A protein has these predicted regions:
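RNA pseudouridine synthases
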Residues: 1-6
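Catalytic-pocket segment enriched in acidic/His residues
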Residues: 12-155
Length: 158
């Protein structure tokens, strides 16, 4: 068993289109990079998680500040499924997720585990002749980014 940093990427434009399903939101090619390696023998419960967007800190929190701690999450998962060697469990992200654009450099750092660095690539346009097309709404932005995000001229109502 071990721990690693992960960048839990999501394309929330599909959230409304797919009636809440997270398959396309979280399951596109290149999503969820993990690394820089798996580290064992580290107690991450007091680790600091930091996310950088183009060198600027946009998320900064302790693992111990999570609403559901690692011990609770593992116990809850084990009540419902068998965990096998090699299974990856993502525990969540600190508040203040931010949108990314092609060319942005995203770094996820967990103290004791290292720093994962990724550059956002342009994704191919969806095939307009097949399936539901991506769309964005104010409600989706609020869920995806948190209510404190300044969306510019996008109005987010309560």
């Amino acid at each position: 068993a071990g721990f690693a940093a992960a960048n839990d990427v999501g394309c929330h434009d599909y959230r409304d289109t797919d009636a809440g399903s997270m398959l396309r939101v979280k399951g596109m090619d290149g999503f969820c990079p993990i690394g820089p390696g798996i580290v064992s023998g580290v107690d991450v419960r007091e680790s600091l998680i930091r996310t950088y967007l183009n060198g600027e800190v946009v998320q900064d929190a302790l693992v111990s500040d999570m609403i559901f701690g690692i011990d609770y999450q593992l116990a809850d998962l084990c009540r419902h499924m068998t965990l096998l060697p090699g299974d990856m469990i993502l525990t969540g992200t600190p508040a203040n997720s931010r949108p990314m654009q092609p060319g942005d450099v995203i770094e996820v750092e967990v103290s004791g585990l290292g720093r994962l660095t990724n550059t956002v690539a342009e994704r191919p346009a969806p095939n307009e002749a097949v399936g539901h097309q991506p769309a964005c709404s104010e409600a989706v932005r609020r869920v995806a980014l948190g209510s404190d995000f300044d969306a510019g001229d996008v109005r987010i109502e309560d």
